[in-house]
Swiss-Prot record:
Record-linked PROSITE patterns: ABC_TRANSPORTER_2 (PS50893)
Organism: Myxococcus xanthus
Name of the molecule in the record: O-antigen export system ATP-binding protein RfbB
Family: Belongs to the ABC transporter superfamily.
Listed Gene3D superfamilies: abc- transporter (atp binding component) like domain (2.70.50.60), P-loop containing nucleotide triphosphate hydrolases (3.40.50.300)
Keywords assigned: ATP-binding, Cell inner membrane, Cell membrane, Membrane, Nucleotide-binding, Polysaccharide transport, Sugar transport, Transport
Subcellular location: Cell inner membrane
């Protein structure tokens, strides 16, 4: 039988849970009998909460897939089905490969065992032999950077230490599939960069990554595909920039309609967000943007940079028809969607005499100057017949505490005024200071 090209396959998967009684206990034979004697017996359907109502989703091998959706839409339930923590109420679920997961903080760790002992236990649970875990023990400990704390009980660990240990174990057991639920922020800036580099290494090795997050910029920056869970169903799967754009539009429509944001599982019919009218989504024009990348000065992929660094935005496109009036736009956005800067070839009088097919658009920024935070760059090809766009997200990390969104080039000078007296003299090797008074 040929090996499947898909890592995860879900067909008509339903997951339901029993409601709790008023006392906070699950319904039992006794509680149902008492309800029946009081004339308050519930139907089977009334005693259930259905989180997933028929999930159909295929995740190809080697792809990074971002799962998005409102709180309560079933994203975490879906991951727990994939990892085997839950079993489907009905439907088929197929997993092809070894899974490692980063779910609830500290899940799978025994609080009274040391970090070293928990590494051994978790490695065995994830399918490794004792000898394999011991062979990788030093590498896992070194990556976690826990030092002498590795031999202390994990109940003494901070949340950041928990996350470091969990990430180190999950990424060093050689999984085929890595599952992550909202825990990419693993520790300080240094460890976050290290973790991102490890994730990039996973992608280069062709591993499958499934990520649940509310950070849409992370999905746009990291993922090959996005899947939107809404009302207990998969509402859309596709290009991350397109799926997140429709999701944002649906959220905006719900807010405009003053729709109640009740958890979908507690809402009759699943509480799906409003449908986005097709006219709200621009038609695709003659120039199609296929991929947008962020590169550094060496031409290498860029995820994190400092305010003083430059960057290059590179967009691959194809021409599908006459495009005499095409106009390329580049827009810098903050994490909350605010436009910080936008320009276009037309506004800068850039002549587009002949369009190559396929072609590459390059937008070079010598120095970005943005302060620390999450940003995205959107490249659009606009024409009278429609528009095509792509997005790449990135993070700026700054060691300096500053306010605002932009750092202009500047320097500080302290000089004597026209009528000033002799100033403070600085001896070589001493720290200069200005005294007032």
């Amino acid at each position: 039988m040929p090996e499947s090209m898909d890592a995860i396959i879900l067909k008509d998967v339903v997951k339901s849970f029993r409601k709790r009684t008023i006392r906070g206990e699950y319904t039992t034979f006794k509680s149902e009998l008492l309800r029946w004697l009081r004339g308050k017996r519930q139907s089977r359907d009334a005693s259930l909460i259905t989180a997933l109502r028929g999930i159909n989703l295929t995740i190809p091998k080697g792809k990074t897939v971002g799962i998005i959706g409102r709180n309560g839409s079933g994203k975490s339930t879906l991951l727990k089905l994939i990892t085997g923590i839950y079993t489907p109420t009905s439907g088929d679920l197929q997993i092809n490969g070894r899974i490692s997961a980063l779910l609830d903080l500290g899940a799978g760790f025994h609080p009274d065992f040391s970090g070293r002992e928990n590494i051994l236990i978790n490695g065995i649970i994830l399918g490794m032999t004792r000898a394999e875990v011991r062979a990788r023990m030093d590498e896992i400990i070194a990556f976690s950077e826990l030092g002498e704390f590795i031999d202390e009980p994990v109940r003494t660990y901070s949340s950041g230490m928990y996350m470091r240990l969990a990430f180190a174990v999950a990424t060093h057991v050689d999984p085929d599939i890595l599952i992550i639920d909202e825990i990419l922020a693993v520790g300080d800036e240094h460890f976050s960069k290290k973790s991102l580099a490890k994730m990039m290494d996973f992608k280069r090795q062709g591993k499958t990554i499934v990520l649940v997050t509310h950070e849409l910029g992370t999905v746009e920056r990291w993922c090959d595909l996005a899947a939107w869970i809404d009302g207990g169903y998969v509402r859309r799967v596709g290009k991350p920039s397109e799926v997140t754009a429709e999701y944002r539009e649906a959220i905006s429509l719900a807010e405009a309609q003053s729709a109640a944001f009740t958890p979908p599982a507690l809402t009759e019919g699943g509480g799906a967000l409003p449908q986005v009218p097709s006219e709200s989504l621009p038609a695709e024009g003659p120039v199609r943007i296929h991929r947008v990348q962020l590169l550094d000065a060496r031409g290498e992929s860029l995820e994190v940079l400092s305010p003083e660094e430059g960057l290059e935005v590179r967009a691959d496109f194809s021409v599908e028809g006459p495009c005499e009036d095409v106009d390329f736009h580049v827009r810098l956005q903050a994490a909350d969607g605010r436009t910080l800067y936008e320009t276009s070839t037309r506004s800068e009088a850039v002549v587009l005499s002949r369009m190559p097919n396929p072609g590459v658009l390059r937008f070079v920024v010598e120095r970005l100057g943005a302060l620390g935070g999450d940003y995205s760059l959107v490249v659009s090809a606009r024409a009278s017949k429609g528009e095509s766009s792509g997005r790449c997200a990135f993070r700026v990390v700054s060691a300096t505490e500053e306010e605002g969104v932009f750092r202009p080039p500047h320097r500080w000078l302290v000089e004597p005024g026209a009528n000033s007296q002799a100033g403070v003299r600085f001896e070589p090797g001493t720290s200069p200071r200005v005294e007032v008074g």
